[in-house]
Amino acid sequence: MKKKLIFLFLMVYVVVSFSQSQRPNIVFIMTDDQSAIPVRTSDNQNQSRPFGFNGDDKVHTPIIDDLASKGIVFSQAYVSTSICTPSRYAMLTGKYAGRSEGKSFISSFPLGKLSRTANNIELEENITNLPRLLQTAGYTTAFIGKSHIIDHDILETYTQGTNGFMAYSKTADPYSTTVSNTMKFNHDKWSNRMKEFGFDHVNAFYPGNLRELFNNDLNIHNVEYKNKAVLDFIENTNEEPFFIYYSETIPHGPAPYWENSNGYYAGLDADVNLTAEGFLTQDYSYLPSRTDIKNEINGFSGKDPRHAWLRWFDHAVGAVVEKLRAKGKLDNTIIVITSDHGDFNKAKATNYEGGTKVPLMVYWPDGITTPRTYNELVQNIDFAPTFLDVAGVDTSNITLDGKSLKNVLTTNSTAVIHDDLFFEIGFSRAIRTKDWKYITVRYDDATNTKIANGDTFSGPNGTQVSLPYYIPNTSLGSLGAASYPLYHQKDQLFDVANDPYETTNLFESNPEKATEMRNLLRSKIVDISR
């Protein structure tokens, strides 16, 4: 009740310290499942790659790399949870996902109970968040792209015609006008629902992953479709300042870099007219054709043609930049490019670096005077405090776990923002300093009883395993466990400064550092306990 009263208070009184004309527009651009760690020759080559500014020389992202060279690159950027939904929650609230009081999460893990953070997190109906606060401060807010942060209970069944949605099958033909109209109806219903969480405009909306459109033909990426929605918003809004949450679906599965047996990629080879609204024809001539993009990358010696999707996305970012420039809004717009989490060497849904470390660059001509690389720790919980700070919003009565990066952006500051970072995923928690990381795996009482009794747990494809994975998603869990031999170890200590791939557990051999890091994690857990 207290939080609801705070929210209602904030809705009528937000302190704004800058005039409307001074406050920057914010364009927050996020990929899906993209690590910041370059892929080595010894690694599996058939996995997502980062941007060129992250040091990967097999990709071609000249537009994004140019923005990075004129802005700030954050070399030590992390997410607090290395899976989609909780990471996005942290970005839109400035809080650790384990604090969520969303209906699905709180029903499974009431306050005071050990939680298992996974894709069970949702934005709350009546608790303040970033877009709601920005709305109250006079910002026009827009949501474009993937959600996965509301109404999980509805998401699983909506295409069966539940909750006021219209039904269609996985094999329904989106080229059929009747089917496409049904898909359009559902898209618009989802979009209107998303508006209730603080967004004035919602378009090109995906309620979850591509497969959660529950149609075989629509299980493809469409960069142009989402990009045009962003450009249309910028073109048609005369309101300033504005905040755009631009959430791409690439490179999440179906991976746009995976070539099937017929030489087909579920992105650049798909029909540009297949969208979250069904079959929709629009003018995308402002972008190079998909064939031209593939040919461009194929023409570069030393580049990996499987990752032409990165140039596809790069062109989309360039289109946003040019639209802002044409409207005279580029200089006073903050452009952020990052990802919801990584998946380097199958570290998604773990607390290892490959899952938690993400690309991050910020471009802001009016605000950033000295382009550079910032080498201190930052985390996705810092986005909301930063955006609220530059918007002039008083956050003194708001629960925020993150810290504002405004001074890093607007001065030459190299000051440390975080001495340490906290991570949570399912049964695992972790703490990381600049040089060390401690990971712990702890089960709840019911799970410990099953283990003691010799019971087994669900594995992938109907198999049984002796120990549970961190999260209920057995596919992700099995990939992480197979890729990281230490996955199930109760206590893991890594000298990440010298062992960045976390191959050697020093918990037993360095008891002094182990005790220090364990106490640090305990203190953090106490501070954020629900």
Pin down the residues of each PLM region.
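Bacterial Sec-dependent N-terminal signal peptides
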Residues: 1-22
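Active-site-proximal cap/lid insertion segments
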Residues: 24, 31-58, 185, 189-196, ...
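Structural recognition of the beta-strand scaffold that forms the well-ordered cores
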Residues: 27-30, 38, 73-79, 84-85, ...
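Active-site segment of extracytoplasmic enzymes that catalyze sulfate/phosphate-ester chemistry
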Residues: 28-29, 35-129, 133-143, 152-163
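Short catalytic/ligand-binding loop motif for oxyanion handling, primarily in non-cytosolic enzymes
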Residues: 36-38, 83-91, 99-101, 149-154, ...
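Polar, surface-exposed loop/tail segments
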Residues: 91, 146, 150-155, 331-332, ...
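Acidic, His- and aromatic-enriched active-site or binding-groove loops in soluble protein domains
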Residues: 98-103, 158-206
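C-terminal, low-complexity/hydrophilic appendages and adjacent surface loops
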Residues: 352-353, 424-504
